[in-house]
UniProtKB/Swiss-Prot annotation:
CDD domains: Ribosomal_S15p_S13e. PANTHER family: RIBOSOMAL PROTEIN S15, BACTERIAL AND ORGANELLAR, SMALL RIBOSOMAL SUBUNIT PROTEIN US15M. NCBIfam families: S15_bact. GO terms for biological process: translation. One of its GO terms (molecular function) is structural constituent of ribosome. One of the primary rRNA binding proteins, it binds directly to 16S rRNA where it helps nucleate assembly of the platform of the 30S subunit by binding and bridging several RNA helices of the 16S rRNA. Forms an intersubunit bridge (bridge B4) with the 23S rRNA of the 50S subunit in the ribosome. Part of the 30S ribosomal subunit. Forms a bridge to the 50S subunit in the 70S ribosome, contacting the 23S rRNA. Gene3D superfamilies: 6.10.250.3130, S15/NS1, RNA-binding. This is Small ribosomal subunit protein uS15.
Length: 87
């Protein structure tokens, strides 16, 4: 993920200008990294080190999504719809 794509995601999902810490932004950035790493692992099937990193990122995203669903269910539903996440 390059700097321009990262800024684009922050602008789209941030609650204000320069908002990088909100759960929505963190989940969006993690989702982008997860998708990129998933494509990498389709080609490099034996890269177990990266696979572990992927699983850790998925767990971190799951925790942020759980937090967001507890805090504000509407923001949670909007986010998973925009990102195309299941559940």
């Amino acid at each position: 993920m390059d700097k321009a794509r990262k800024l684009e995601l922050i602008k789209k999902f941030g609650r204000s200008e320069g908002d990088t810490g909100s759960p929505e932004v963190q989940v969006a950035l993690l989702t982008e990294r997860i998708q990129s790493l998933t494509e990498h692992l389709k080609v490099h099937k034996k890269d177990h080190h990266s696979r572990r990193g992927l699983l850790m990122m998925v767990g971190q995203r799951r925790g942020l999504l759980n937090y967001l669903s507890d805090q504000d269910i509407e923001r949670y539903r909007t986010l998973i719809k925009e990102l195309g996440l299941r559940r």
